[in-house]
Amino acid sequence: MQEPATHGDVIEQPLIKVSAFWRMFPAGMRRRWWMFRPFDLIARHFPIFRPRKGLLVVRMDGIGDMMLFRQSLEHYAEVFGVDKADITVLGCDSWRLISPKIFEGYKVITIDEHAYARKLMYRLRVNLMVRRLAPKITACDSYLRRAMMADSLVWVSAASRTVVSMPYVNEPTRSEFTFYLSQVDEVIDTGPYPTHEILRHFRFVSTVAGKNFQPQPPKINWPDQRPALAADGPYAVINPGSNEPGRRWPFASYVAVAEKLLAMGWRVAFVGTRGERWDAKLLDDMARRPGVSDLTGRTTLPELMDLMNHAGLVISNDTGPAHLSIALGAPTLVIVGGGHFTSFVPYPESACPDNARFIYKQMDCYHCFWRCDKRASKFEVFPCVAAIPADDVWTVCESLMNEYQSESARPMAAG
């Protein structure tokens, strides 16, 4: 994959300017936007009587997107001329439990982003809280973002300086993005779709700074809390779930790989949320096998981090825990579909750590944005995911295990 230069471009603001009349009565807005508008205005103009200070970084991301962003944050203090202690990350409740370690040294506030986009009174409370932060600078470099979430929060902060990246815009979202982008100070073009998110984040800080920063892969310095499972020899963590049913590699294929691991004397732990037990009977049958632990719905996010941190192998669909596992340094294989291929996975060569592997089956219909027309229902696995053979996955697993015979995965039998 060709990788763009690290440095991006600042979009000239006249290109996104609109008339005062259009800004007062913008066309093409959703009914919900109009419902929220008077309350957003109240929050934006709520009187604040203390000096503005610090930097607010808006990250309405899932866990995986947050991890792809995390390394670029280390440059924000230098780039924006603020102390690290004066940087506040506004993020999502989904990663609240691990944020004290992931963002050590930064202030972190998390919200329920879905409630923010739907519930009027919750939104008003959050907006007033953001306004009271009184940041001097607000920044947001998400590409695949929602205007009524991320851009609304940037707008409500009413910071003295606002810097955002150019988002992915289509016709249904054009009016909303135009409204918000026309009112920020700087818009950074981080590259065309499907530029990888890691490259985007580093292009953003490079453009603001006026100098290049080399992209860095995700990395977490996680406390060494050895889980009970690690006491009895090597084990693999299998994460077969996803909040998008189509991204779930067939569970029977995961079972086939698990059988090979068990035959080698390894143990297998299935993880995920309780709602992701999408093939419960097959999972229950597997859980009765010696050496198999069904931990779905039974671990907190920090406990899952501990499990992956000591695993000899992690196999996962394209979902948040896969990025966490890679950042922990665990040998990780990610099973990838083509919805927005190369935007998030696989990682670009310049920012791909040695412990990460990605497997996929290229198809002509890649880059469908997960709007697949080749399945009968939204609960079926995407064909590009289902087409990945279990034998191919096992071949990559063997390679990873041979390369990473860590303390938690010493004795290895012949396959």
Where are these regions (language model features)?
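Catalytic machinery of carbohydrate-active enzymes
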Residues: 1-415
